Amino acid sequence: MKEVGIVGYGSDLPKYRIKAEEIAKAWGKDAEAIKKGLVVNEKSVPGPDEDSATIAVQAARRALSRSGINPKNIGAVYVGSESHPYAVKPTSGIVAEAVCTSPEVTAADLEFACKAGTAGIQMCMGLVSSGMMDYAMAVGVDTAQGAPGDALEYTAAAGGAAYIIGGKKEELIAKFNGTYSYTTDTPDFWRREHEHYPKHGGRFTGEPAYFRHVLSAAKGMMEKMDTTTKDYDYCVFHQPNGKFYLSAAKQLGFNENQYRYGLLTPYLGNTYSGAVPLGLSNILDHSKTGDRIFVVSYGSGAGSDAFDITVTDRISEVINKAVTTEELLSRKKYIDYAVYLKYRGKIRM
C-alpha cells in the first residue's frame, strides 16, 4: 500500500454543557452514583443553531487551516454520523460546498453507529493510496440524543472532528502504519425510522458488544503489526462512557500516560461518531515527532476499526494553526435542564 497519512485535522464542540447533577435532579436520581458508574461528569449540548452539519463544517475548516492545501484539490468528502440533519439531503454536500471544494468531488454520508467516522477515514486511505486522488476528507460528527430519563441522557453529547488524508510524504502530520477491522451482526443498540430516540440492550451493550469488538480489533491490529502495548505512546478507544474506555485500556495493558489524552468523555459525554476522531485530535495536539498512536473505534450493530499511526516532525508546525480540542473543551457555558430540553427539542406537543 502506498504510504498515506493525515495532512490536516480539526475539531469542533458546542459551548453549552449540562452537569450530571442537573439531569439527576430532574429525575430524582443519585448523581454521585451515576457519575461514579459512568465516569461522566457533564456533557456537551448543541445550541439551537447547531447540528451535525454546522459542527462538521467548523471541524473541516480547521482541518484545512492545519493542512495548508487548496480545498479544490480534495477529491472526496465523507461525513459519518447517526444524526444527519436531513433524512434525504446529504450532509457531505453541505460540507464540501462550505469549505470550497471543487464541484468535481465525490461525496457521501456514512452510517455505522459510532464508527462511521473511522470508516470514512479507511475509505479515504483507500482512495488516496490507489492514486485516484491526492486528498480526501473524512468527518466523524454527531449530536446524539437519549430519551428523557434514560441512562443515555447523561452521556449522549455533540461534537466532531475532521481529517484530511493525503499521500505526499512532506505534507504528512502522521502516517498510517496499518488498519484492521472486526465486524459482526450484534443488535446492542438501534433506532427505527420515525422513532425519536434509540433503544439499547442495557448490560448487553458491554461484554458481547463493546468489549468483544474493541478487544478483538485491538488484538488483531497488534498481531498484524507485531506490536505490544509498550510500542505505543498513546491510545484512544471509543468511549460510550468513561468506565468502558478505562476497562478496555487496562484489559489490553495500557497505562494512564498512554490513555489520558484520548479520554474526553468525563468532560464531554459520548459524541458517538465524533468520539474517537475527537480523542485522536486531542492526542495529536499533545504529540511530538515519532509518537506512535493506537486507535480503536466502535459502532453498535456492531464493529470496530483499529489504526496504527506514527506522528511526523511536521506536527509541531500545525498544532497552533487552529484551535486545539483542549481549548474547545475549556470554552463552556452551563445550562439547566429546562434550557437543555428546549435546545434539544425534547418538549413535544
UniProtKB/Swiss-Prot annotation:
<keyword id="KW-0808">Transferase</keyword>
<feature type="binding site">
    <location>
        <position position="30"/>
    </location>
    <ligand>
        <name>(3S)-3-hydroxy-3-methylglutaryl-CoA</name>
    </ligand>
</feature>
<comment type="function">
    <text>Catalyzes the condensation of acetyl-CoA with acetoacetyl-CoA to form 3-hydroxy-3-methylglutaryl-CoA (HMG-CoA). Functions in the mevalonate (MVA) pathway leading to isopentenyl diphosphate (IPP), a key precursor for the biosynthesis of isoprenoid compounds that are building blocks of archaeal membrane lipids.</text>
</comment>
<dbReference type="Pfam" id="PF08541">
    <property type="entry name" value="ACP_syn_III_C"/>
</dbReference>
<dbReference type="InterPro" id="IPR013747">
    <property type="entry name" value="ACP_syn_III_C"/>
</dbReference>
<comment type="subunit">
    <text>Interacts with acetoacetyl-CoA thiolase that catalyzes the precedent step in the pathway and with a DUF35 protein. The acetoacetyl-CoA thiolase/HMG-CoA synthase complex channels the intermediate via a fused CoA-binding site, which allows for efficient coupling of the endergonic thiolase reaction with the exergonic HMGCS reaction.</text>
</comment>
<feature type="active site" description="Proton donor/acceptor">
    <location>
        <position position="238"/>
    </location>
</feature>
<feature type="binding site">
    <location>
        <position position="31"/>
    </location>
    <ligand>
        <name>(3S)-3-hydroxy-3-methylglutaryl-CoA</name>
    </ligand>
</feature>
<comment type="pathway">
    <text>Metabolic intermediate biosynthesis; (R)-mevalonate biosynthesis; (R)-mevalonate from acetyl-CoA: step 2/3.</text>
</comment>
<dbReference type="InterPro" id="IPR004656">
    <property type="entry name" value="HMG_CoA_Synthase"/>
</dbReference>
<feature type="binding site">
    <location>
        <position position="203"/>
    </location>
    <ligand>
        <name>CoA</name>
    </ligand>
</feature>
<feature type="binding site">
    <location>
        <position position="243"/>
    </location>
    <ligand>
        <name>CoA</name>
    </ligand>
</feature>
<comment type="similarity">
    <text>Belongs to the thiolase-like superfamily. Archaeal HMG-CoA synthase family.</text>
</comment>
<dbReference type="GO" id="GO:0003985">
    <property type="term" value="F:acetyl-CoA C-acetyltransferase activity"/>
</dbReference>
<feature type="binding site">
    <location>
        <position position="238"/>
    </location>
    <ligand>
        <name>(3S)-3-hydroxy-3-methylglutaryl-CoA</name>
    </ligand>
</feature>
<feature type="binding site">
    <location>
        <position position="270"/>
    </location>
    <ligand>
        <name>(3S)-3-hydroxy-3-methylglutaryl-CoA</name>
    </ligand>
</feature>
<dbReference type="InterPro" id="IPR016039">
    <property type="entry name" value="Thiolase-like"/>
</dbReference>
<dbReference type="GO" id="GO:0004421">
    <property type="term" value="F:hydroxymethylglutaryl-CoA synthase activity"/>
</dbReference>
<feature type="active site" description="Acyl-thioester intermediate">
    <location>
        <position position="114"/>
    </location>
</feature>
<feature type="active site" description="Proton donor/acceptor">
    <location>
        <position position="82"/>
    </location>
</feature>
<keyword id="KW-0012">Acyltransferase</keyword>
<protein>
    <recommendedName>
        <fullName>Hydroxymethylglutaryl-CoA synthase</fullName>
        <ecNumber>2.3.3.10</ecNumber>
    </recommendedName>
</protein>
<feature type="binding site">
    <location>
        <position position="114"/>
    </location>
    <ligand>
        <name>(3S)-3-hydroxy-3-methylglutaryl-CoA</name>
    </ligand>
</feature>
<keyword id="KW-0414">Isoprene biosynthesis</keyword>
<feature type="binding site">
    <location>
        <position position="205"/>
    </location>
    <ligand>
        <name>(3S)-3-hydroxy-3-methylglutaryl-CoA</name>
    </ligand>
</feature>
<dbReference type="GO" id="GO:0019287">
    <property type="term" value="P:isopentenyl diphosphate biosynthetic process, mevalonate pathway"/>
</dbReference>
<feature type="binding site">
    <location>
        <position position="300"/>
    </location>
    <ligand>
        <name>(3S)-3-hydroxy-3-methylglutaryl-CoA</name>
    </ligand>
</feature>
<feature type="binding site">
    <location>
        <position position="155"/>
    </location>
    <ligand>
        <name>(3S)-3-hydroxy-3-methylglutaryl-CoA</name>
    </ligand>
</feature>
<dbReference type="GO" id="GO:0010142">
    <property type="term" value="P:farnesyl diphosphate biosynthetic process, mevalonate pathway"/>
</dbReference>
